[in-house]
Amino acid sequence: NDLADINNDGWVDVITLDMLPKDEAVIKTSAAEDTYEVYNFKLKYGFHKQVSRNTLQLNQGALNSGEVLFGDIAGVSGLESTDWSWAPLMVDLDGDGWRDIFVTNGIVRRPNDMDYISFISSDSVQRLENVVPWIAQMPEGKVSNFAFRNKGDLTFEDKTVDWGFSLPSFSNGVAYSDLDNDGDPDLVVNRINETALIYRNNSDPGRFLKVIVYGDTAGGNRYAIGATVTATQGDQTQTHEIFPARGWC
């Protein structure tokens, strides 16, 4: 998951990922979440309602009671399905002042493929002494990562192809940093069984503000972890929190 302000209201929002496929064919050939019996069993023992899809929890601010209210808007935002996903990053990739969303994707094998489950569960396969060769027949899940442009109205546009992220891979961790000091964030993506990817951001950031934050060296927080930087212009407030890790590492 990742935490950042996606609508510039000063409140930190939350995105969490699951594994709802984007491709209709993959949806139809994948085993769904728990059966109704298992679903109710989990509810009985205190688990919350489980649905296999992404969520984007919009922070709606503090109530009169002091509690903070969140609401899931992933469905209306266009972010609820990104397949077998791992790390989301909420970061302004195109320099328009709104945080976009990048999602790493892919799994080496899809153990929930229903055709494969049916095949491997058959008596003829189960009677074999060595099933290792058949495990290799499990379908792979090499898919592209996703990039979504924040349109500024709580909806996102899929820019995966336009922004150059259409390469299928098994990607996990991702980090962003301005590697070439040109004002826009570049991406480093970790992949399974392959070299890492480095994506140079070629957008034109125009004017940008660079802030250096110093922490309390004596107190052991040299890099100011946990610090918050806010910039306000008109009715827009951009909030950035400093943490050494985001998404899924």
Where are these regions (language model features)?
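Hydrophobic beta-strand segments that make up the repeating blades of beta-propeller
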Residues: 14-17, 101-105, 182, 186-191
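Residue-level signature of beta-propeller blades and closely related beta-rich strand-turn architectures
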Residues: 18-20, 62, 107, 193
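Beta-propeller blade repeat segments, especially FG-GAP/WD-type strand-to-loop junctions
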Residues: 27-37, 51-71, 114-118, 142-157, ...
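Gly/Ser/Thr/Pro-enriched helix-cap/hinge segments flanking short amphipathic alpha-helices
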Residues: 140-146, 150, 155-171, 175-249
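Beta-rich catalytic cores
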Residues: 2, 52, 84-86, 143, ...
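Short, conserved, GDST-rich strand-edge loop motifs in beta-rich repeat architectures
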Residues: 21-48, 107-139
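Short loop/turn motifs that recur once per blade in beta-propeller domains
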Residues: 36-48, 71-82, 131-132, 139, ...
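Beta-propeller blade termini
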Residues: 1-8, 58-59, 86-95, 172-180
